[in-house]
Amino acid sequence: NLMFSTEMGSTADGSMKIYLRPETAQGIFVNYLNVQKTGRMKVPFGIAQIGKAFRNEIVARQFIFRMREFEQMEMQFFVRPGEEMEWFKQWKATRLKWHQAMGLGNEKYRYHDHEKLAHYANAATDIEFEMPFGFKEVEGIHSRTNFDLSQHEKFSGKKIQYFDPELNQSYTPYVIETSIGVDRVFLSVMAGSYCEETLENGETRVVLKLPAALAPIKLAVLPLVKKDGLPEKAEEIMKMLRFDFRCQYDEKDSIGKRYRRQDAIGTPYCITAVSYTHLRAHETLANL
């Protein structure tokens, strides 16, 4: 059983057995008509959400790749019956482009089409990323047919069909689902950006080559030395930039060590405050 069970109630005798959700999707299905009506939406339309999910994994392993509690982003896209395969192909391509746009390298991604389908699906594929331990799923795209909505309708006894004004008829929509493990995407970014460089003296150092769009610190402002008015000039630069970029100011240790610290956290740009004297000295040495 993949679902975690627990009890709800103030006393043991009066408690009720409940289950933690293994996916976020079902909350969307039971509320889709409310969202459709209040948002005045027409098929095709999608509803997306992010939240916690829980699965009773027998073996939780590979760092944060497989956990019993994890963050999930899902979208349910409601379409007319008979049009689901066309939309499935479109979302399959769109979702791959989204992952590739992160800039980790297109060759690190691939599709894995399912040969054996779940009971609710008529098509399914995974987007896999090349982790240090092989290609692993980071997102699943599924054509769930109308199974979920039909089951909710059957067991609730309440009609939850959509009225299509263009066709002038009611029907149970088919659903294309995209499901992402947020922790897995984070792991793919870290794994795809982590590098170790070997120096001439045999030592190794870490460089986090994050794509600039994903880097938490966009730039660092560094005075070359802690004198000659350079810290004050660097702070002026910092004040000009901090409202537009997430910046970091650092004046401790040598300039080389400060560059190394920024390399280790994936900062794409560094601005170094130098004086005219330092520039002239550098130019003189370069010409020797």
Residue ranges of predicted features:
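Single conserved hydrophobic/aromatic residue that forms the stacking wall/gate
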Residues: 278, 285-288
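NTP/phosphate- and nucleic-acid-binding module
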Residues: 1-280
